[in-house]
């Protein structure tokens, strides 16, 4: 905040006359928002890189954007267009040197004669823009059947059944009897809702026990449960940027929207580094003093391409340059490691499986902050953070996304805890999922159907065109009774549209063969590009580029779960 205030006071003569305490009352987000609306400061921000994505220094620019501005009256010409938004009793505390006299009034006649803004037309135009660029999203009415996993029925016609191939219930825990029974028992005893926020009637044994289970899973001192991991990421990252003095974020270019928005809401400087590019990350870290607070935000499994972040190497760089690590394991918890703690645990598999000693500190111990979800491999809903006791307590005490929302229902938390404990005790589901993933990838490769190469459980089938991706999805559903959702912009870049396939333990070889045959039929009917076509064009996303990767799960590790 102090850095933003200093920069603002240098750039704008009206802000320069305002006390730092008054400016701080606006907060990072509001100050930046107000400045962006100003024709003077808005231009300055554009020139000086306030909103740049990577490595810019707002204080290094020298363009004098105020050269032609009359400052003799001491009143901001931009602010003078608006009526007071503060109570009259607080006029002395107006920011930007505003006064009641200087603010003036909106011309009454113009306001009465103006035409009302056409809101519905505006909404329609925004929707039409989505249709025009082929990124409009259609929702399929899919009702997953617990007793027939991975089958579902469409709409209200229960006989219209399809096989679901794109759900994030990776292990089928949403219908696991242990989870369902725990939820039934808790629901019958404690009712449907939590009754309030954690501070007001919503703190209960289920939250305490779930957070203890999560902390133990990641070998951290404490954990905190949120309504979703989107909220967990947004709330935590934004708080870090607001709380740490002169904080700088370092964000992987492929980070999830929840992390991007959390960083944006934090209001601190952001540096984007090329996806999984350690040399680029180090070069950008090296520009800042070691004493500057830094947050390196990245993921373990990137869900749209299946790539895996270099966790150990990023921890090395964090130690070298004085940063903390923020690791999103949303698509990895439950899926990797002997107990399902994620990729960080999996990288020290033997240590956690058999107690083998490592020559270095375990990677899980080196990660400062974990975030994860209860809504994917664990089959429930909710998100969480895990870290040091002091860090978690700070987030608990300051993060609006935690403080001002109703607690998850007791039954949901009981089910999530049951799922975590179940997956801690067995690897059979993870091994079955990995086995089916390899089977599908191998069969598609044999037919030349392009799969983005990766070492994880994600099977991204490259199409490369939004309209064709939707057509392929529709054809799979209507002709083959197979549901695979098309993935388009903004989830993936334009031109990299794909079908995202996620095998589960329930997708046995017979269902896998049906999927492969259906994809072959669709590729022929729509004349979609195969690996050889992408190779001739120079390749894309690793397809047709000679990229080979080894699965993260080794054959030896898979054998442990088959015993």
Curated annotation (Swiss-Prot):
Question: Which residues catalyse the reaction?
Answer: 376
Chain residues that bind substrate: 137, 251, 270, 491
Which Pfam families does this UniProt record tie to the protein? Answer: Aminotran_1_2
InterPro entries referenced in this protein's UniProt entry, alphabetically: 4pyrrol_synth_NH2levulA_synth, Aminotrans_II_pyridoxalP_BS, Aminotransferase_I/II_large, AON_synthase_class-II, PyrdxlP-dep_Trfase, PyrdxlP-dep_Trfase_major, PyrdxlP-dep_Trfase_small
Q: What is its main location?
A: mitochondrion
Coiled-coil regions listed in the entry: none
Q: Which cofactor does it need?
A: pyridoxal 5'-phosphate
Sorted keywords for this record are:
Acyltransferase, Heme biosynthesis, Mitochondrion, Pyridoxal phosphate, Transferase, Transit peptide
Q: Per its record, what are the GO molecular function terms?
A: 5-aminolevulinate synthase activity; pyridoxal phosphate binding
Which residues are recorded as modified (N6-(pyridoxal phosphate)lysine)? 376
Q: What is its EC number?
A: 2.3.1.37
Q: Where is this protein found?
A: Mitochondrion matrix
Looking up PROSITE patterns in the UniProt record yields: AA_TRANSFER_CLASS_2
Question: What is the catalytic activity of this protein?
Answer: succinyl-CoA + glycine + H(+) = 5-aminolevulinate + CO2 + CoA
Q: Where is the transit peptide?
A: 1-18
Identify the enzyme class. transferase
Identify the pathway. Porphyrin-containing compound metabolism; protoporphyrin-IX biosynthesis; 5-aminolevulinate from glycine: step 1/1
Lineage top rank: taxon: Eukaryota
Q: Where does pyridoxal 5'-phosphate bind?
A: 303, 331, 373, 405-406
Gene Ontology cellular component? Answer: mitochondrial matrix; mitochondrion
Family to which the UniProt record says this protein belongs: Belongs to the class-II pyridoxal-phosphate-dependent aminotransferase family.
Q: What does this protein do?
A: Catalyzes the synthesis of 5-aminolevulinate (ALA) from succinyl-CoA and glycine, the first and rate-limiting step in heme biosynthesis.
PANTHER family documented for this protein = 2-AMINO-3-KETOBUTYRATE COENZYME A LIGASE, MITOCHONDRIAL, CLASS II AMINOTRANSFERASE/8-AMINO-7-OXONONANOATE SYNTHASE
**Subunit text:** Homodimer.
Q: What is this protein called?
A: 5-aminolevulinate synthase, mitochondrial
Q: Which organism is it from?
A: Yarrowia lipolytica (strain CLIB 122 / E 150) (Yeast)
